[in-house]
Amino acid sequence: MKKAVFLALFLSSTSFCWSQSIKLDDLKINEIQVIGSHNSYKKAILPEVYSYLSERDSMKFLPRIQYEHIPIPEQLDLGLRNLEIDVYADSKGGKYAHPKILDLVKTTQPFDPEKKMSKPGFKMIHITDIDYQTWYYTLEDCLKDLKKWSDAHPDHDPVFITLEPKDGKANSFGTEPEHYTPPLFDDLDNELKKYLGKNKIITPDDIRGNYKSLNEAVLHKNWPKVKDAKGKFLFVLDNNSENRDLYAKNHPSLKGRMVFTNSDPGTPESAVLLLNEPQKDLSKIQDLVKQGYIIRTRADADTMEARSEDYSRFEKAKESGAQIITTDYYLPSKLFKSRYRIGFDKNSYERKNPVLTK
């Protein structure tokens, strides 16, 4: 029964998304509004791990990460046009190969049976040692799947992808992520080019064109039309501090880089901004959208809106004109009882931008 319902939803949304896409072709990519997923690669925490952690969760943190996603190609088939990926550096390999929680909990499912986490390269997990269930152990495998899907759907509308470079202090198990450096960010760019292909990426250089800076180009609305961006991806770095600055170092206006950065409005590198509180920042987002920036915001966070079936944040996100709205619930949760589901009219996930078009 569940499969039949999903199939009906998929077919109806696919048909509508195709007709909707035609209507968007002559708009620029900053003149549309799309819905996408947050931590798109994430699987649910295994029940036995969740049970063990919940008994020790005095801060009631665990319910905030009680969400999951269908495989990324299925998300794209459904019509989502934004993804979010967390990326851990692992230049020597093996740093995240054995989640420490497995020393405390016996699980029925093996972790990384093909030992992909033991090899050098960028890894995709949510929280080391705890929330480690993922559709992709490596960024390489994820990019290969994105290319495969894109090649099979060459006329797909552009897909926005937020990349969050995860590092920071050691967790309670003592695992300290590898810290990013300019050479590691060079490796990240090369990974995108190698496994997805530069021809499939909308780069800062593409948008800057002949303008003096990327920001000047954005303020002149120098974004491509949807029909000219079909089959492509646009990446944004989800960091507004040290890692952002490291990525941009020696790359003024992000010259030669593959990924946009969350840089302050008015700075040479500023083009795409992350403003996650549409209720608080409604007028600010609307103003930035009108100026030419692309904005990412959120319909929900930490499962709270889904548990209370509260759509007020999503309504403000739509009203704000933010081009990208992320959610954990493009489909209702199967982990707790809720009818909460995010989408536009007729089960679509893409439409004209209400602030910039009529």
Locations of regions flagged by a protein language model:
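Bacterial Sec-dependent N-terminal signal peptides
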Residues: M1-S21
